Amino acid sequence: MKVFISYGAAADQVTALRLQALGAVNGLTVYVPPAHTRQGLGVLLDSESSQKLSEAEVVLGVVGTGLAEACRQELNTAMGLGKNMIIMSYPAFAYQLQQYFANLVVVDPANPGEAETGIVGYLKAIDAQQNAKKALLALGTLALGLLLFASVDRD
């Protein structure tokens, strides 16, 4: 299964790369756009990211420290392509994302169980193959753990 991980800002790349490694050891082909795509206000997606996004069966959005224009474009493109998506965000960025993504899961470090419930609820609602649901659940759970660990590291 091919997964595209769109991350909010350059600082979120660490979480995305950890998810990529965890996905790879579980048999997933995971693409994470390079950090240079999060610098500046690029107008278009780079060609490699665009191709990988088109090939992906699942798109996971990780917005922990900010929302770069490249991430916004990737997520909008994924929506336009009808990709199975799940977007995870800290509460600070939820207001920016809620109006665009019905499948937003807000990760509150004080109440991680609520985010897990949101992920499971979303996965039950989408009409996707069983493998895609399992992959999304696994990646969502891993992302939740990594985001929580990242918040502990900052404290």
Residue ranges, per PLM feature:
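Short, structured coil segments at secondary-structure junctions
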Residues: 26, 81, 99-103
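Long, low-complexity, intrinsically disordered polar/charged segments
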Residues: 1-13, 49-68, 113-127, 131
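Structural signal for conserved beta-strand scaffold positions within catalytic alpha/beta enzyme cores
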Residues: 32, 87, 106-108
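Short secondary-structure transition/capping segments
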Residues: 2-9, 75-87, 133-143
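Conserved N-terminal substructure of TIR/SEFIR domains
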Residues: 1-58, 141-155
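Short, glycine/charged-enriched secondary-structure capping and boundary segments
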Residues: 18-21, 73-77, 100-103
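C-terminal interaction surface of TIR/SEFIR-family domains
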Residues: 13, 92-155
